[in-house]
Amino acid sequence: FGLQYVVIRKPKPMDTATLNYSWQMNGTNAFSIYTNATDTIDDKSARQAVSSVLRFLTRMGILKYNNHSGYIASVINEHELLAVKTYDGGFYRRLKSPGDPVFHGDIIGEVIDPFEGFVKSQIVSQTDGIVFFAHTAPTVMGNQVVYKIIRRMHE
């Protein structure tokens, strides 16, 4: 597909009811492609997803289409992603987006008190790496995962 990352994860109970899962259990190669947004339209990541499918179909000989070769994917196991959680609930201000580099100690988000409007807590990166997932909804609860970071292994 030529995407930057391939994430390997164990199926969750919800996955077992999907057509993709059923196909895989019956020996068919099936893939899922996810973009940056699932509840809104993100034009940039949607174009990237379309390009990746066209690239795959071209490589399989199903389609003739001229496009760039894409990335050599980094394979990541989901359990290797560092989950960053909130301490408090409230309004959420995201300061970093997927693909942004972060460093240990960077302030990457804030939780704002919904009644008084002050910053209740700051969300701090616990490692050097690249943001893989960033929460987008305007509110958060305490102890909620708001970022997943790919840890930087070396320079």
Predicted regions located by residue number:
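Structured catalytic-domain cores with a bias toward divalent-metal coordination
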Residues: 1-155
